[in-house]
Swiss-Prot record:
<feature type="compositionally biased region" description="Low complexity">
    <location>
        <begin position="184"/>
        <end position="198"/>
    </location>
</feature>
<keyword id="KW-0443">Lipid metabolism</keyword>
<feature type="modified residue" description="Phosphoserine">
    <location>
        <position position="180"/>
    </location>
</feature>
<dbReference type="GO" id="GO:0006629">
    <property type="term" value="P:lipid metabolic process"/>
</dbReference>
<protein>
    <recommendedName>
        <fullName>Increased rDNA silencing protein 4</fullName>
    </recommendedName>
</protein>
<feature type="compositionally biased region" description="Polar residues">
    <location>
        <begin position="248"/>
        <end position="260"/>
    </location>
</feature>
<dbReference type="GO" id="GO:0005739">
    <property type="term" value="C:mitochondrion"/>
</dbReference>
<feature type="compositionally biased region" description="Low complexity">
    <location>
        <begin position="157"/>
        <end position="168"/>
    </location>
</feature>
<comment type="similarity">
    <text>Belongs to the IRS4 family.</text>
</comment>
<feature type="compositionally biased region" description="Basic residues">
    <location>
        <begin position="409"/>
        <end position="438"/>
    </location>
</feature>
<comment type="subunit">
    <text>Interacts with INP51.</text>
</comment>
<dbReference type="InterPro" id="IPR011992">
    <property type="entry name" value="EF-hand-dom_pair"/>
</dbReference>
<dbReference type="GO" id="GO:0031505">
    <property type="term" value="P:fungal-type cell wall organization"/>
</dbReference>
<feature type="compositionally biased region" description="Acidic residues">
    <location>
        <begin position="389"/>
        <end position="402"/>
    </location>
</feature>
<dbReference type="InterPro" id="IPR000261">
    <property type="entry name" value="EH_dom"/>
</dbReference>
<dbReference type="GO" id="GO:0006897">
    <property type="term" value="P:endocytosis"/>
</dbReference>
<dbReference type="GO" id="GO:0000183">
    <property type="term" value="P:rDNA heterochromatin formation"/>
</dbReference>
Length: 615
């Protein structure tokens, strides 16, 4: 009778059909595996079997007699070439003729497949009685199903689902062993697909009646199992399947024993997980919080938000200066964890000590000083006494500090600068003795730009002449002696060429100096040479110069010197002696006069002594 096997692969919850080359390779691997199991008649059937065709049944003695030695040799040779591919073999699928074995070994391939199928069917029938006792234990495991159960039994359930052949059987042909394996499969698939209602039809009524009603799993169960854990389970399941179906006949018993011990260890771990629900709940909350926001913030002092706050506060200190003293409080604001969503004020532990070591210290101070090297302390600058306050910072992992910029220890350079700025003696800045720039003329204080000289300078003469030109020949007809238009014009010919200025206009100009009228009248009498109520050019310029000298603070001289009158019509080429030089010269003159007086007194004294001695 001819058997046809269609090779498929179970991956990611779906069954994928293999290629022709992969199907031929997997068929060879299955033949070698069944040949190894046929040699072990006394050993129990492995928990994972391939699909069986009930139509091909041969007796066990006939299978053992037909070419056992030849198949063992062929299996040993094929183990080096067969890849480890996990397959299933449903019925009614035939492989293509291109990838089948050679014509010489065609009969061997078909006979080996028939032998393997018959052997698997017979051994499953014999082990059904033994596995009925284990089905009750597996049913109780399903009652105790928890989120931790899915993670613990995921390896066994996936290995049985990927290598088992229950998918090719009908619900009536499934054994209790297969049902127990399906219970484990549904416990794991319920965590991944969030429902297990579509896994088993209503044919298993007897087994469902024996099971008590259990509490449904939470809907967020799948989120507790990370993607990394699922990949690990897949890798472990593939490793266990490959090791379980290894082609070495000497290690088959050891592998079967390991599978039984792993199941017992799983049951023990399940009991431990059920006895400690509080620990499991706390672990689930931490995993969900970490899964939603990535890695946990193990060092909150160096998070991105705190670095931004630190830079902002540093910029504010540079622009607005340091914080005032009344803003530094004795207690700090501490934020609680984000899980509770509450903000509380807790007084943090703070020690009012400095980094200066004293000769006499208590045990508490020694412990506090030793903790400086452990890195559990923070520093805060105290501007009142130019020190750094130290306080404990053991709870920095769970609390976020708002004033992080003030809690870090300043650099050595900043501390030295602060000490120099506070301790250095500030010297007052003195103005230089020598004049660094030219002073401008101050109209409100004209005496500050005046030098004591005895003649009219060129700048002063130009300023006075401009006023003379703008005010001469005005209102002269008001004078009594000024000739009329119809009168004699002989008097006009005797007037000076530069012209004249009316005395009333001169008085109005000089009054702007705010000098007293008596002083102005005295100046006018000293410069008036015409005695007819008018002033000529020389008299007006000299009078203006005397007014300025009075404004500079000099006393009005009794008689105007001739050098002043001469400087009006000439350009003075003499150098101006500075005031300091004039003062030094005057001091030297006084000193010489004192020396002269002393010498005169000595001579008089000598004369008196000689006169007395002679007498």
């Amino acid at each position: 009778m001819r058997l046809s096997f269609g090779k498929q692969r179970y991956h990611g919850g779906t069954t994928v059909t293999l290629t022709e080359q992969g199907a031929s390779d997997s068929l060879r691997a299955a033949q070698a595996i069944f040949q190894n199991h046929s040699n072990e008649v006394s050993s129990p059937c492995p928990p994972v079997t391939v699909s069986r065709n009930p139509q091909t049944r041969l007796s066990e003695p006939s299978l053992q007699k037909s070419g056992r030695k030849q198949e063992q040799k062929k299996a040993r040779i094929r183990t080096k070439q067969v890849p480890k591919i996990k397959t299933t073999a449903p019925n009614d699928v035939e492989l293509s003729k291109k990838h089948r074995s050679s014509p010489a070994g065609k009969d061997n391939v078909s006979s080996t497949a028939q032998m393997a199928a018959a052997l698997a069917h017979s051994q499953s029938k014999l082990s059904s009685d033994n596995n009925s006792s284990h089905s009750s234990a597996l049913d109780t495991l399903k009652v105790l199903e928890t989120p931790n159960l899915n993670g613990l039994l995921g390896i066994h359930s996936r290995s049985s689902s990927r290598n088992g052949s229950n998918e090719s059987l009908t619900p009536g042909q499934r054994t209790p062993d297969n049902r127990s394996q399906e219970n484990l499969l549904t416990s794991f698939s319920s965590g991944r697909r969030l429902s297990s209602s579509s896994m088993e039809p209503a044919t298993n009524k007897d087994s469902n009646k024996a099971l008590p009603k259990r509490r449904p799993s939470p809907p967020l169960q799948s989120s507790l199992v990370g993607s990394g854990q699922l990949h690990e389970n897949e890798n472990l399941s593939s490793i266990s399947i490959d090791s379980r179906h290894s082609l070495n006949p000497d290690t088959s018993d050891v592998i079967s024993n390991r599978s039984q011990t792993s199941l017992s260890q799983t049951i023990n771990q399940l009991s431990l997980c059920e006895s400690e629900p509080s620990i499991a709940s706390s672990n689930t909350t931490t995993t969900t919080s970490n899964q939603g926001s990535g890695l946990p913030n193990l060092v909150p002092n160096y998070s991105s938000d705190m670095r931004k706050k630190k830079l902002v506060n540093k910029f504010k200190r540079k622009v607005f200066g340091s914080k005032p003293k009344h803003l530094s409080s004795q207690y700090e604001m501490d934020a609680s964890s984000e899980e509770l969503g509450q903000h509380e004020q807790q007084p943090s532990m703070r020690f009012k000590t400095t980094l200066r070591k004293t000769s006499v210290s208590t045990n508490a101070e020694n412990d506090h000083a030793s903790s400086l090297h452990e890195g559990n302390l923070r520093y805060k600058y105290n501007p009142s006494n130019d020190t750094y306050d130290v306080y404990d910072d053991t709870d920095s992992d769970s609390e976020s500090d708002q004033n992080q910029d003030a809690l870090t220890k300043p650099r050595k350079r900043d501390r030295i600068k602060r000490k120099i700025r506070n301790s250095a003696n500030k010297t007052a800045h003195h103005r230089p003795i020598h004049r660094t720039r030219d002073r401008k003329f101050n109209e409100d204080k004209p005496w500050k730009s005046h030098t004591d000289i005895t003649f009219v300078t060129d700048n002063e003469r130009k300023r006075y002449e401009s006023m003379w030109v703008s005010n001469r020949h005005r209102h002269l007809n008001l004078l009594s002696w000024w000739p009329s238009i119809t009168g004699d014009s002989g008097a006009i010919n005797t007037l000076p060429e530069d012209g004249l200025i009316l005395g009333i206009i001169v008085r109005d100009i000089w009054k702007r100096s705010n000098l007293p009228n008596s002083l102005l009248a005295e100046i006018y009498t000293k410069v008036d040479t015409r005695k007819d109520g008018t002033l000529d050019r020389k008299s007006f310029i000299v009078g203006m110069w005397l007014v300025d000298q009075c404004l500079y603070g000099r006393k009005l001289p009794n008689v105007v010197e001739q050098c002043v009158w001469d400087s009006v019509d000439r350009y003075a080429s003499t150098t101006v002696v500075p005031v300091s030089t004039l003062k030094a010269m005057a001091k030297q003159k006084r000193k010489q006069m004192k020396e002269e007086i002393k010498n005169i007194k000595k001579e008089n004294r000598v004369v008196l002594v000689d006169h007395n001695s002679s007498s």
